[in-house]
Amino acid sequence: MTPNKEDYLKCIYEIGIDLHKITNKEIAARMQVSPPAVTEMIKRMKSENLILKDKECGYLLTDLGLKLVSELYRKHRLIEVFLVHHLDYTSDQIHEEAEVLEHTVSDLFVERLEKLLGFPKTCPHGGTIPAKGELLVEINNLPLADIKEAGAYRLTRVHDSFDILHYLDKHSLHIGDPLQVKQFDGFSNTFTILSNEEDLQVNMDIAKQLYVEKID
């Protein structure tokens, strides 16, 4: 499988998490390619039983497609752990590096890397690392955007976005840190959270990319 096709698989998977319907237009926008290029790739992927057309959802990954996506995330996140713990990369540096390496390392390399790292369960951004042969099921899956009540929470996962990671680093907010959800303003569509004795106004776009758990 080519790196380009693997990127399409991940793109379709991620759109399916964010949106109800996966369209050629959305794929083209995220992949930064032309609509005809998307149409051609979609044809190939359908012929290889990686995706199928769905009236309501646009496209769905097949079991084979989901298996391949899970393996890509497994490689990517194990590489991120290695970069942070053994090569002193920072959390906002590792994503782009792992994006390149995930397409080049062998299955044997990944198995030995996982053993070297002590079989980690999550990446530095809090994303779940699926075991070999298992589908990806995120452990930390409650977005801040879905929080309905004020209270004490803990940051458990963030999207692999440079802008988000830079924003969190600027405010010294890291995976595992406690935070207080003080209120939600429906008019401005923002959350007020307290972190490190600082009130932060978090808009809905950011809140969708931060995952938390309630602290009892």
Task: Give names to the regions the model predicted.
Residues D18-E26:
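Short acidic, hydrophobic short linear motifs in intrinsically disordered regions
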Residues A29, K46-S47:
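Alpha-helical residues within the helix-turn-helix
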Residues P36, D92:
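Key DNA-contact positions within bacterial/archaeal DNA-binding proteins
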Residues I42-K43:
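Short, hydrophobic-biased segments on the C-terminal half of alpha helices
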Residues S47-D54:
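A short, conserved structural fragment
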Residues C57-H76:
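Basic, amphipathic "hinge/linker" alpha-helix immediately C-terminal to the N-terminal HTH DNA-binding motif
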Residues E102-Q209:
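Mid-protein regulatory/catalytic core that forms ligand/cofactor-binding pockets
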